[in-house]
Amino acid sequence: VLIVCEGSKTEPNYFRELVDHLRLNTANIEIDGDSDPSPKSVVAHAKRRYQQEEGFDRVFCVFDKDEHSTYQQAVRDLAAEEVTDVFTAITSVPCFEYWLLLHFIFTTKPYARSEAYSPGQHVMRDLKLHLPAYSKGSQHVYYQLMPQTDLAIRHSERAGQQAAQNQTDNPTTQVHRLVTYLRALKNS
């Protein structure tokens, strides 16, 4: 399993902590935060690694929409690849921190740019109401939130259903799909 993350710290830290907690064999799961921080770069990096290295039966590309101009192209590129059942897009709109916020509250409030803040910065402000010490790249976030992971999964699934009904993706996250997949690996 290869997990390629847009972020070099926050997302890789979270998934490394999850893999560690589940006691999954790290020889079989590689978490890569070395791509450039754009959705298109994440997808290109993941495809390159998959083509150059053998042994990856699943490849997850973890990236945010926030205000990235290459988001839609990356989603389309992966949709074309998903027919192989190898590549999966794990998107968050507007950002990964929305997944973290769902550990505390259910919200489908759309996040938009204001004069002072990007959509992602608005999510960060909401998250800090519940997790005041959080900052990008924080360590041990998974362990802090672990007791609420099942709640976050339910919130994420519900938000996705509501977003589909409302024909929007703001806000949504697919991180629950990767968390559920990794949990299933532990039980297989």
Question: Which residues are covered by each model-predicted region?
Answer:
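Short, extreme N-terminal leader segments that mark the start of a protein/domain
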Residues: V1-G7
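C-terminal accessory helical subdomains adjacent to catalytic cores in phosphodiester-
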Residues: L2, P12, R16-G33, Q51-R58, ...
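Short phosphate-binding loop-to-helix
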Residues: S35-H45
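Short amphipathic alpha-helix with an adjacent loop that forms part of the alpha/beta core around
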Residues: H45-Q51
